[in-house]
């Protein structure tokens, strides 16, 4: 394990101390956070319950109130599916049959329309409160179910629409309905609460503060139908989700035990949402990471990296990646689960986002101790990383650059030489021309670490010649470093100046020679001329 003393010694050997261990591994506020912020098509935070034609037909046949159903269906509807006065009259009538029939009509409007008239429903005075009142009708489970369905679909709308459901007092009643003896009612209550929690961090915290977790977790202890389990784990993931601020960990950590066995359910939807929940819970300081590790989920998460559905692989990879942002011991737990072979496989994924997050995960492993860097070498991962550094999309190249530079920062002389022999210098030099200042710094730091090793070798063998200077010149790196002396970022131009002065000597600069800019590639263009044996004379 890396000791604080070793880390401090490593830092003191830098001229530029900006790349500290926190920057090397715990890149949560930058690349790591950016990875989490991206919109995921695989997971919806809100879901509308839409009946299929088959379900509708079955319902018509099984309905006891056939006359009332026909009465509703024959109502004169205004253009655009507006709510009729008959519907509101029936909602507020004292007849349970009329109440049910009208509620079903509202439900159909909110379920079938491509653009459901949610605003029209909530703007009809007293209607939302009436549906909440119907939730309390324990003697009429069908009315409870239909009302819950209506409110679920209202809560599937925008934040203002969701707030109407909350302000009508629905949340505590929905939580009570999680313990209903009728599974249809339970499931619809879960769905509604999932929609409300998925709206915003404020709604999520309100639902948590209403003490949803005990009855929700109790649902998992029963033999449920699959749709119930799917809805419940989805609601659970929404309760764990959110960064600004995250949920109070003490309120969501009790779900870890349930999540640990949900990882062994065969259904991909259940697996995906369980993995997302674990990725949210592991996204934070080391004590949260430790709680996730202590739940015993790491080995199964690593196994799921090889799942055949990206819907499962993406959140499993996110969770594994979050865990290795922890300390060396926490990172080792993942390594002990044989994660590297799975990660190597993901580096060749046709899905760019998977490839990128695999690189990000590996970059946090190479920020560990030398033994951990060696496991990455032994797994033969660096050839793939260097290939990615040369050919992948820029967002993926960035993560590969971090993985390689982190290895040069903490690696031994032999480990750094291995990276040079694999050909890491040329792609690092190529990154010096990109527009992203942070990645230019990462590439400069990697090259500096290599040059420092060369200087030590030159002193040790008495030759006085740094073997890596020539390799950087051959890769047109010297041109690029010299150009960076005029970079607008102070840290970059200072680092470039220091590298030239310390490793390449001072040479006259022709300020009239400036590279062109290729905006499509987000980088500068340098003429690729042959380097003379004595180096460049600019």
UniProtKB/Swiss-Prot annotation:
Residues 149-241 are annotated as: NLS binding site (major). It is found in: Cytoplasm; Nucleus. The modification N-acetylmethionine is found at residue 1. It holds the Pfam family Arm_3. Polyubiquitinated in the presence of RAG1 (in vitro). Residues 20-41 have a biased composition (Basic and acidic residues). Its main location: cytoplasm. Low levels in all tissues examined. The keyword Secreted does not apply. Residues 1-41 are annotated as: Disordered. One of its GO terms (molecular function) is nuclear import signal receptor activity. A motif (Nuclear localization signal) lies at residues 42-51. Consists of an N-terminal hydrophilic region, a hydrophobic central region composed of 10 repeats, and a short hydrophilic C-terminus. The N-terminal hydrophilic region contains the importin beta binding domain (IBB domain), which is sufficient for binding importin beta and essential for nuclear protein import. The IBB domain is thought to act as an intrasteric autoregulatory sequence by interacting with the internal autoinhibitory NLS. Binding of KPNB1 probably overlaps the internal NLS and contributes to a high affinity for cytoplasmic NLS-containing cargo substrates. After dissociation of the importin/substrate complex in the nucleus the internal autohibitory NLS contributes to a low affinity for nuclear NLS-containing proteins. This is Importin subunit alpha-5. It comes from Mus musculus (Mouse).
């Amino acid at each position: 394990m890396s000791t604080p003393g070793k880390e401090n010694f490593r830092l003191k050997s830098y001229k530029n101390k900006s790349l500290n261990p926190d920057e090397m591994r715990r890149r949560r506020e930058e690349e790591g956070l950016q990875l989490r912020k991206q919109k995921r098509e695989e997971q919806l935070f809100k879901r509308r319950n839409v009946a299929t034609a088959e379900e509708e037909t079955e319902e018509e046949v099984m309905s006891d109130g056939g006359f009332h159903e026909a009465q509703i269906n024959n109502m004169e509807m205004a253009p655009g599916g507006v709510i009729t006065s008959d519907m509101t009259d029936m909602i507020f009538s004292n007849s349970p049959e009329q109440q049910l029939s009208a509620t079903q009509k509202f439900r159909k409007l909110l379920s079938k329309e491509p653009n459901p008239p949610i605003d029209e429903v909530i703007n009809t005075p007293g209607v939302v409160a009436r549906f909440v009142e119907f939730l309390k009708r324990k003697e009429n489970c069908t009315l409870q179910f239909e009302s819950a369905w209506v409110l679920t679909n209202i809560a599937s709308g925008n934040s203002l629409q969701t707030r109407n459901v909350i302000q009508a007092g629905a949340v505590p009643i929905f939580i009570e309905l999680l313990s209903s003896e009728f599974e249809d009612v339970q499931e619809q209550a879960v769905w509604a609460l999932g929609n409300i929690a998925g709206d915003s961090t404020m709604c999520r915290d309100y639902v948590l503060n209403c003490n949803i977790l005990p009855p929700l977790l109790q649902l998992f202890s029963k033999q449920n139908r699959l749709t119930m389990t799917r809805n419940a784990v989805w609601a659970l993931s929404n309760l764990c989700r959110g960064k600004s601020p995250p949920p109070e960990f003490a309120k969501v950590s009790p779900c870890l035990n349930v999540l640990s066995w949900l990882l062994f359910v065969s259904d991909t939807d259940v697996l995906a949402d369980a993995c997302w929940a674990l990725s949210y819970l592991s996204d934070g300081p080391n004590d949260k990471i430790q709680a996730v590790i202590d739940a015993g989920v790491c080995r199964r998460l690593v196994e799921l990296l090889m799942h055949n559905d990206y819907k499962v692989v993406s959140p499993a990879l996110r969770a594994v990646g979050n865990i290795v942002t922890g300390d060396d011991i926490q990172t080792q737990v993942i390594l002990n689960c044989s994660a590297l072979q799975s990660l190597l496989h993901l580096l060749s994924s046709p899905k760019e986002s998977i490839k990128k997050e695999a690189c990000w995960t590996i970059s946090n492993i190479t920020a560990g101790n030398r033994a951990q860097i060696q496991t990455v070498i032994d797994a033969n991962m660096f050839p793939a990383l260097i290939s990615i550094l040369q050919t992948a999309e820029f967002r993926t190249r960035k993560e590969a650059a971090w993985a390689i530079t982190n290895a040069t920062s903490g690696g031994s002389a032999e480990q750094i030489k291995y990276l040079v022999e694999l050909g890491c210098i040329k792609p690092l030099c190529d990154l010096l021309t990109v527009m992203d200042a942070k990645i230019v710094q990462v590439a400069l730091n990697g090259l500096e670490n290599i040059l420092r090793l060369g200087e030590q070798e030159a002193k040790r063998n008495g030759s006085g010649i740094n073997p890596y200077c020539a390799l950087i010149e051959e890769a047109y790196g010297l041109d690029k470093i010299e150009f960076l002396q005029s970079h607008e970022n102070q840290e970059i131009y200072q680092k470039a100046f220091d590298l030239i002065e310390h490793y390449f000597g001072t040479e006259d600069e022709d300020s009239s020679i400036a590279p062109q800019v290729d905006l499509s590639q987000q980088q500068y263009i340098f003429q690729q001329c042959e380097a003379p044996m004595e180096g460049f004379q600019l």
